[in-house]
Amino acid sequence: MKNFSLFILLAFALLFASCGDLDKPKHLKAIAQMDKSLDSMHIVLKENRLDTLAGIQIAANALLTRIKTYYVSDTIDMELGKKMNQFKRIMKSIKPKKGRGANKNAESNEIIITDRSIGNGFAVVHNGLKAEEETLIALKRDIENGNGRRDKYAEYIKFEQQKVYQLQQLLKAYVDHKNKTIKDFNEIYAELNAFSLKLMEKK
């Protein structure tokens, strides 16, 4: 009787293992698709990197200094004040804040961006892609070698697919925000820069 029970247990173990092996190609295919998505996101992120961040900051500081130095008026120019405030808001959207970035929700593992600047947005997506790549490498290795809880592989795959989707949404938000912010910056900078240069000419 004991031998028969042992036989039944071995049979179930073999059946369980064979089922896991049957699902292996499907799991590996899902990981390959996620890897492909990450590669595509890396390309888009690289194409939308703001390499002129330091140059923009220098130009903005010079513009603000000229206006502060040469603008003198006995009355308050409300229109100029609005444009200056708009310009400063745009600069806050471009320059990353020190010590702030992205945190993770402990319950859902969702990435929460605490600093919406362009500089930080790039870092959040870049670091997220790198972390996800490392996670998928480890998961792929476990599935190939049959390590860990085989019955949880499908659940792990689904969880990582959700993270990849979130990274896609973060990347799209970063690109949209970057494009709009730079467009707004160029428009207001051109106007205020021309104004500041005229002030210099009058002196």
Q: Where are the model-predicted features located?
A:
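Sec-dependent bacterial lipoprotein signal peptides
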Residues: 1-19
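Short, flexible helical or helix-coil boundary motifs
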Residues: 8, 71, 91-94, 98, ...
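Surface-exposed, polar helix/loop patches in the mature regions of secreted/periplasmic/lumenal proteins
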Residues: 92-160
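C-terminal amphipathic alpha-helix
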Residues: 137-203
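Immediate post-signal-peptide N-terminus of mature secreted/exported proteins
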Residues: 19-90
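Non-transmembrane, amphipathic alpha-helical segments
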Residues: 23-26, 30-33, 45-48, 52, ...
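Subset-of-secretome marker
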Residues: 33, 37, 61-68, 72, ...
